[in-house]
């Protein structure tokens, strides 16, 4: 049995949860790293936030600490994002991130798109004749905090298939703290490719103050082509 993201999305459409927006900043010139920003307005407090993340694509791991700015004064979201960008600039320079160098945008399924499969996605790399397939698998996991809140939680496995060969991009052994207390559903949103480097952005759904919240999880991987 797996957690059902569509039901979470249906609740999100009916209730005022906190659905973050995504800003893909770009890849480094060699494609080894990339950076992205997630931003929005917190449910409950109504204050803006902006968080920058830096990914080592070859290792599918964080390249360095994230940068987060949360408003406490009632400033505009634009002002909060500007402060976060300024704070993130040293890391963007350190990792050689080129703003706007987003490569080829191969797939886009925003949260408003209800006509696609949540856990599978097929796309084609420009120089490869065969398609790739991403498949998400969710494994319900017991968590004392989530059980006390009567909220679901799920571990994530992500498989990538190409030319009949499957490889694992992500396999959770435990719930990462970076996803919040109770990540209860996952969904493919965007896929980018640059210099044979893959960047996949997933929606991660958790229970929020006023309804389901959504944040982003990014996966990176070097690609093989035929």
Segments the model singles out, each with a brief description of its role:
Residues 1-226:
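Exposed acidic/polar residues on beta-strands and adjacent loops within beta-sheet cores, strongest
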């Amino acid at each position: 049995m797996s957690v059902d993201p569509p039901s979470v999305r249906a609740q999100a459409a009916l209730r005022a949860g906190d659905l973050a927006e995504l800003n893909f900043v770009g890849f480094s010139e060699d494609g080894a790293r990339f950076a992205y920003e997630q931003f929005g307005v917190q449910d409950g407090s109504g204050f803006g936030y902006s968080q920058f993340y830096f990914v080592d694509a070859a290792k599918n791991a964080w390249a360095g600490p994230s940068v987060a700015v949360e408003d406490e004064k009632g400033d505009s979201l634009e002002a909060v994002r500007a402060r976060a960008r300024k704070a993130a600039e040293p890391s963007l320079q350190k990792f050689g991130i080129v703003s706007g160098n987003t490569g080829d945008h191969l797939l886009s399924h925003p949260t408003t798109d209800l006509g696609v499969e949540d856990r599978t996605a097929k796309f084609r790399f420009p120089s490869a004749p065969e398609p790739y397939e991403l498949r998400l698998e969710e494994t319900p996991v017991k968590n004392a905090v989530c059980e006390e809140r009567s909220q679901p939680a799920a571990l994530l496995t992500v498989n990538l298939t190409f030319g009949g060969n499957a490889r694992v991009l992500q396999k959770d052994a435990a719930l990462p703290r970076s996803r919040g207390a109770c990540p209860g559903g996952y969904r493919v949103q965007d896929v980018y490719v640059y210099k044979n480097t893959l960047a996949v952005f997933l929606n991660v759904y958790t229970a929020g103050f006023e309804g389901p919240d959504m944040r982003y999880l990014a996966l990176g991987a070097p690609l093989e082509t035929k």
